[in-house]
Amino acid sequence: MNTAICETLFEDMGLTMSKNKIVIKLGGGLITDKSHYKLIREERIQSVCKIISKMIKNDDSVILVHGAGSFGHLEAKKWHLSRGHIKEIIDEQRLAVKNVRNDMIELNNYVVKYLKEFGIEGISHPPSKWANGLGPQFNGDITMLGDEKKDTIQVTFGDVVDVHNEREFGILSGDDLMVRICKEIPGITHCIFLLGDTEGLLTKPPNEEGSELIPLWSNEQEITGSHESSQDVTGGIFLKAESASKIAQNVANVWMIDG
């Protein structure tokens, strides 16, 4: 991640003025190598944390959500956790649920550690401790994510949560958390999705010929692509676009950019 480029983008977003209230999503593919189990991209996390520290010093407030990347998706894919209870492998699934939750806390600890290096205290809220159910309609009180204290930000992440029906468990995406945060916490001025390995929302996958950046997208505009289900057990770019569309009903500035 090029810090200078990122700062220029934030200027374009109108973030040079203070008193903004910003929700940032760090994509799992940005902060980890999604093809290798539990491999973080340390320099990218540090770069983002540096920018966040500048926002805080600018008297902005920030809520941080991060994805799972290779700390969650690979194990969840192996044991079909997104499908919920499967009788034939339920013992293995329950062990995988425990392991993924622990792995997500480990990844979150990395994020909080790098925030601390830049003088920011991250207060973590693992969804498995306070949320249940799936999609943006999940059950859980998110008001604590709106708490604001000097040099402190609230941090949460995509996680495996309980589901109070025959499914037993499922995956609550960070994108669904973003929708609820931007809808229910008052005063949000900006919502920023920092993506990994793509410059933003494209007309086609970045490796396909003719793929172009969409500078301003509406949900009437078609995007095509393939969801990399071998590495991502949520909705990939399609869920992000859908989530961004919902968020835009409440927040004027919604951005999807290359992290």
Where are these regions (language model features)?
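N-terminal glycine-/serine-/threonine-rich phosphate-binding loop
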Residues: I5-I63
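Glycine-rich beta-strand-to-loop/alpha-helix junction loops that act as flexible
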Residues: K25-G29, V65-G69, I257-G259
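Short, active-site-adjacent cap segments at secondary-structure transitions
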Residues: L30-T32, G69-L74, W130-N132, V161-V163, ...
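Glycine-rich loop at the start of a catalytic domain that most often binds anionic cofactors/ligands
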Residues: G69-H85
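Ligand-binding beta-strand-loop-alpha-helix segment within the catalytic cores
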Residues: H80-V161
